[in-house]
């Protein structure tokens, strides 16, 4: 079907053509014929890179041409939301259009009343959940919902929130029932998911670039048709590396294409990129290497003390045309790598599996170095769905006539071919009725449904029976009854002719935390030790909460360090029975040294903690400290509220308490604060006394920063 045949106005058709769209892919045509332009709800279950975004865009344009209601686009990740915002922002350029696109994710937020005035809003699922919690006025104006990566309903972490959002929307619990466009990877129970959502199903295995799936074993590549070949694999090169995954990747680079290698650990990702880079560089021209040298310089932070070994290794690999990508890198580094791989400057990229579910970085050849990944319980095989998402990155539309994915096998290739290549992705299983999820969302339902009158258990059961999990669980009512009793025990709900939240329950609902965790925190605070500071005690408690992540284990080398810290801080117990010498992890050590001002390079050397890890730890810790602070405030414990306010500032800035007055000044971060303190400028009063010239002469300050400081404090 040609773009011209769509029932859209001429200006919109011309815009789509200007973006390179002339003809619809088969799944896109199927979606149009199924009714996405006619207000029909549709679940599109197709492989990666099969044009799902254009389907959402067409539905959006059609909806807004006929209705005044809003379109919301839900994504599971902030990076994906930013990507979609860039794509949908282009719609504002349609001739004669007054269309406005906004974003709300926590990292990237439109300002002021832009969400109220926007026609299209891009949100993460968690942000949408918060908007529903705060009952923003515009949520009653939603006419079309696009849910990207809807198969993540089966994810134990993010799934329950998404499931509750969709249940509320599809049942008309908030506003009118909207049109729903759900975008999913290929799953085996897509018909069940479509029926639950009230969607028609569009299902296809079609890809814009044909995919060849194969398994490598013992110098031989066996494809999905069981045809064996050596491919173009250079056995000498493979032997030189002793790692077939690298040889397979380099083979593609030699042909002038890009390759993506999935490794199962961060260390193997770094090692593979470092090793492969030496040989990638041999294939590159002088001007390509010069460009890569410039890119590598942008990777290194300006401050020497922020240059960790990991970042230096990344910069060195990039010089050679290779790179690695994992959660240990900070967002700045990851963005550079993603951009330069898309631009074609980086030829070989290694990554942990997290990239498969993240931003779209296709390559001619994808190599899966192992089908095992390390998890909480040791090594475990990846799911078929994970495998399909990885190999779905193979083949770049407009560049490749074929994409290749290759599993590196140990032993016979047959079991890999049968299980992964021929396999059907697992069925989605709802996570909404797990103990923690059910407590959170039960309290949420009661808090939002009983403004004027209590909600009955019958109504609660009726609502949860409309969730994806509630459809088939014959123990639904029993599970709900058990969790309701728990909430009453926690003094978060009352049952007097129906359920209503107590003031405490309402508070915990606003905080969006497991009621059991909130109950435990309350018990700790009631038993708090008076007269002391509790900094270490708070950090110990936070790192032991179920909601805390990422959690890193402890090595023998760190045992002695922890014992030493415990001896110094045992007087900082938060509550009487707190055992500071037990239940601690490396994450606690990282936090303690972070708020003491330790540099990134030293953190990396001492604890193997990288900037990306530290960012996640401090962000999550600050959030949990805020929750604890709000619980302390609810119980009118001002002493702990004040202490937690200070702790949160230290977590945010990564400094000792004595630097806090300095880091509150814009452009004075932890590095400059340390330098100012060294020169006896301990606070704003000291800075007011010094001349502009003397302030500018201090290392790492300079005239521009000095003027900025003076403007703020005088």
Located regions from the model:
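Conserved P-loop/Walker A NTP-binding site and adjacent catalytic elements of P-loop NTPases
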Residues: 15, 21-174, 178-186, 190, ...
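Conserved C-terminal RecA-like helicase domain
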Residues: 73-74, 82-85, 89-102, 267-348, ...
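Conserved two-lobed SF2 helicase motor
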Residues: 116-133, 321-324, 341-356
């Amino acid at each position: 079907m040609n773009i011209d045949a769509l029932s859209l106005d001429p200006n919109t058709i011309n815009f789509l053509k200007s973006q390179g769209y002339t003809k619809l892919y088969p799944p896109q045509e199927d979606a149009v014929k199924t009714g996405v332009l006619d207000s029909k709800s549709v679940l599109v279950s197709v492989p990666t890179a099969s044009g799902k975004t254009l389907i959402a865009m067409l539905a959006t344009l059609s909806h807004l041409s006929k209705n005044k209601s809003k379109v919301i686009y839900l994504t599971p990740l902030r990076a994906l939301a930013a990507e979609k915002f860039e794509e949908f922002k282009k719609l504002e350029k349609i001739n004669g259009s007054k269309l406005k696109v906004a974003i709300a994710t926590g990292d990237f937020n439109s300002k002021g009343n832009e969400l109220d005035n926007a026609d299209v809003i891009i949100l993460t699922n968690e942000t949408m959940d918060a908007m529903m919690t705060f009952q923003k006025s515009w949520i009653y104006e939603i006419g079309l919902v696009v849910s990207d990566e809807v198969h993540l309903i089966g994810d134990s972490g993010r799934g329950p929130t998404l499931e509750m959002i969709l249940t509320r929307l599809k049942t008309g619990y908030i506003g009118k029932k909207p049109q729903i466009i759900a975008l999913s990877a290929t799953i085996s129970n897509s018909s069940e998911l479509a029926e639950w959502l009230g969607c028609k199903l569009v299902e296809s295995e079609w890809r814009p670039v044909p995919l060849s799936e194969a398994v490598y074993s013992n110098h031989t590549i066996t494809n999905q048709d069981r045809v064996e070949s050596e491919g173009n694999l250079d056995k000498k090169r493979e032997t030189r590396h002793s790692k077939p995954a690298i040889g397979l990747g380099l083979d593609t680079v030699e042909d002038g294409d890009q390759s993506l290698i999935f490794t199962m650990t961060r260390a193997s990702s770094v090692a593979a990129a470092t090793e492969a880079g030496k040989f990638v560089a041999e294939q590159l021209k002088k001007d390509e290497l010069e460009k890569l040298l410039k890119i590598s310089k942008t990777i290194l932070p300006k401050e020497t003390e922020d240059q960790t070994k990991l970042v230096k290794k990344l910069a060195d690999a990039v010089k050679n045309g290779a790179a690695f990508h994992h959660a240990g890198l900070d967002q700045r580094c990851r963005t550079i790598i993603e951009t330069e791989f898309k631009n074609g400057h980086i030829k070989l990229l290694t990554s942990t599996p997290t990239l498969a579910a993240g931003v779209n970085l296709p390559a001619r050849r994808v190599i899966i170095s192992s089908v095992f990944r390390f998890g909480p319980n040791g090594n475990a095989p990846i799911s078929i769905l994970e495998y399909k998402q990885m190999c779905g990155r193979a083949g770049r539309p407009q560049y490749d006539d074929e994409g290749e994915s290759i599993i590196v096998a140990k032993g016979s290739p047959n079991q890999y071919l049968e299980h992964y290549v021929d396999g059907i992705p697992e069925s989605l299983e709802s996570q909404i009725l797990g103990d923690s999820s059910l407590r959170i969302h039960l309290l949420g339902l009661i808090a939002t449904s009983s403004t004027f009158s209590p909600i009955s258990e019958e109504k609660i059961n009726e609502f949860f029976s409309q969730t994806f999990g509630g459809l088939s669980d014959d123990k639904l009512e029993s599970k709900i009854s058990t969790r309701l009793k728990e909430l009453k025990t926690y003094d978060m709900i009352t049952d007097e002719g129906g359920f209503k939240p107590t003031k405490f329950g309402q508070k915990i609902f606003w905080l969006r935390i497991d009621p059991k965790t909130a109950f435990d925190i309350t018990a700790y605070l009631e038993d708090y030790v008076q007269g002391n500071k509790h900094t270490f005690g708070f950090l110990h408690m936070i790192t032991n909460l179920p909601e805390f992540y990422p959690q890193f284990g402890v090595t023998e080398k760190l045992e002695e360090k922890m014992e030493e810290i415990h001896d110094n801080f045992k007087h900082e117990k938060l509550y009487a029975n707190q055992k500071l010498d037990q239940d601690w992890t490396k994450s606690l050590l990282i936090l303690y040294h972070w708020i003491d001002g330790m540099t990134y390079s030293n953190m990396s050397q001492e604890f193997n903690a990288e900037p990306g890890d530290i960012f996640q730890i401090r962000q999550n810790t600050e959030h949990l400290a805020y929750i604890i602070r709000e619980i302390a405030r609810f119980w009118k414990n001002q002493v702990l509220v004040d202490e937690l306010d200070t702790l949160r500032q230290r977590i945010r800035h990564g400094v000792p308490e004595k630097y806090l007055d300095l880091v509150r000044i814009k452009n004075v971060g932890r590095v400059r604060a340390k330098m100012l303190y060294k020169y006896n400028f301990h606070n704003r009063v000291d800075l007011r006394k010094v001349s502009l010239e003397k302030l500018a002469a201090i290392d790492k300050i300079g005239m521009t920063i000095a003027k900025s400081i003076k403007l703020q404090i005088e």
